Amino acid sequence: LPEFVSHSEEFFIKYIDERAKTGLFVEGAENYRAVTLESLYNIYDFTENVALKKKVEMFLDIVWIEYAIESIEGIRGGAKARVYNRATDAASGLLWTASLGSLYFNLNEDEKCETLITLIASSYRPPEIAGKIAKAENKGNYEVIKSIPGKGTTEVIKLTNIDMPVYTLNPAGDVITYEYVTPTYAAGTMCHDESTPITLISSQNRWEGAVFKGDKNARIYRYLDTDKSLHAHFLSMQKGPVMIFKKNTSGAFDTGIYIYPYSFAEADGEIKTEGGWLFGEIYDSYYAVRAASGKLLQKEGKILLSDSESPFVIHLGNKIDDGSFEDFKKNIKSNPLTFDGNSVCYNDKRWGRFEFNIKTAERRLNGKAFSCKAENIMECPFINSVKNSGIFEVTFEGEKIIYDFNENTVK
């Protein structure tokens, strides 16, 4: 037993150091993240290894700072993998860490903390700076760009002694998540260099879309109309509030766009649009949705594309950045959108020219190749970490904290 404990401690120290240098989590879905968090909390509370305990504490600090930066009213935004259409977190949840975060930082008095309530018994507490970031209402608009592990192979290894698949993973492999956070919404997508394969747990059921201020269940996201598990079923590009998607899988599944809250018509059929755009308001935010080909349809309480292979645009806004709802609509309707069957091109005065070739998956932004690579593990106004450095610099309202996983110190 002592030898097993020693080897386990060495493994977890190596695991945390590796994650600190090459990216935190592969998936991001709340149910999978919760399992990892519970394990880390247990290590923190019960290990007698001082160095390991400190590393776990530092790692959890970064996790909660990341949560504070990515969240709107405690609800984590950004792209995630392994979020199933059939699961409640796809449409009305993503709330496991949100409920615990709301309790930690007093974000929502009405929020129930059920799934992770046992973690309150832990002696671990998030750093004060995470609470300050989470509760601040004047953070403005900002980008959060992260590099996470996800490259690997599609090979699944079967171990002889346990009945569980093991997914191969290159720990240094890049999958990039991009999130645009404003005071009223947080929108995110995920992309990767397609020249090398990604592991199945990174490609499976990716969730891309936005969460909104005003309702913990408010969402807009793209999906395929099936409960089956799908892999890399969409490709995307994003800059700021503009997201463009294309279906990346064959099959009869309809392409859908989930919007909540949304008022459906009494009868199914073609959805009324303005110049091809579906406009709406979600509390303090605006949205515009347009398919490059075909129409938007209402069918059995769903918004579907009549041409399921068509690329489509989701453009978000709010009163702060775009004026009135009518101002927002006027601007969007003046933006050129063309599609020749191969490439969709969308122009916005502020965010630039988006080009997406659905045949080759080549993407260009303002005439330059759209990059699915990042130099840093995390990059945003409040936290930065250079890849392979093992150092995170956190800054907020004049306060600076340096997490150094090489020296096991916080300064």
Q: Over which residues does each language-model region extend?
A:
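Ser/Thr/Asn(+Pro)-rich, low-complexity disordered segments
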Residues: 7, 11, 106-411
